[in-house]
Amino acid sequence: MLTDNLSAQEENKETLAQHAAMDFTTGIGWNADNQLYRPASDHEGSLDSFLKPAAFETQRLFENDRFPNVIVAMDGTVLAAWNGVAIRRSSDGGKTWDTAQVIAEGFMSGGFVVDEVSGDIFAFIEAGHPPAPLYIYRSADHGITWNKQDTIVFPNSFGHVPTMHMNEHGISLRHGRFKGRLISACRWYGRSNYPVENFHTHYTNALFSDDGGRTWKASEPFPVMGTGEACIVELSDGRLYYNTRRHWAPLAEDALWRWSGYSEDGGMTWTNPRRSSVLPDGDVATTYGLMGGLVRLPVLGRDILLYSNIVSQSGRRNGHVWASFDGGETWPLRRQVYAGNFAYSSLNAGRPGTPSEGWIYLLYEGGEETGGSFSRFNLTWLLQGEKTGNGSLPGWITP
């Protein structure tokens, strides 16, 4: 079910606090900037749930087309988003799936965001291949129905209003001063998407909201040009870790590997950019790069990050998942997911106390046939992968 405007229930909400109280009766707080939040302990649990007997499953969810995002609603419903713009829902942790539902006709923008205060989900949809008008749809029932809301996006200091096209899903912040903020990676196309000579005018950044998704602000640029299609996770100390594709660089080799950086102000600015020496950015025989997935497992007090991309010098194939146990400083482990066709991908993880608990989710372009394939696995399975030589496993995780 779709409507052109917000539902009557949404229009009559007097405050975000009122909305939150309708869905959650305890645990709501206010941060230093008077933003609503729920404590991290409501969303993060123990490591044990991810360390059950090794499990790995794959199934095909979509025929043809492309552009993945996978998110997990507050009740544990897994939503696989695809192309222009369809979703499939799973209420049993990713085992079985409802038939596909079209949110709206348009172009998949990536950047789906779950508001962990209200439980609402935001979908960003563009009228065509960006740059193009951006529309925001909101679901207040874990992705069953969707309503179009006003799109209010404020530019950054350069006057740029970015596009959301094919970034990884966004997140709700749980730690530090800005807990309660919604944030998602986005991008600025500069002069234009093509020709290639314009790539150096591109950059990535972020959109964030401090009022429950009613309005959004564009952050300052990630300080590396030629970037596009990025991911953001929050570390347990409140810093944000940023990881991005780069399809142009003055030195060609700098576009073969992922670039990362950090934010200490909730995603308004980005610092300490550096090139990875272990995380590839697509086929390393080219400088074009490849969208990858990124997630921090919801484990209290641990910064376990997972990243998805390919290990290839001959096209988009041979998908892998990498693991970091120190917030992205080192990536000592990887495991192959699929040896054949593998392109854009999105990662997420299950929520404690729901049917999704303990599962890691990967939606990617490729598989045995064209379209979208979905894998679910646990950390035990991933720990049986190969060592990269980049750091070592900590004692608390060594199998």
Where are the regions that the model predicts?
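Asp-box/BNR beta-propeller blade signature and adjacent active/binding-site loops
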Residues: 10-399
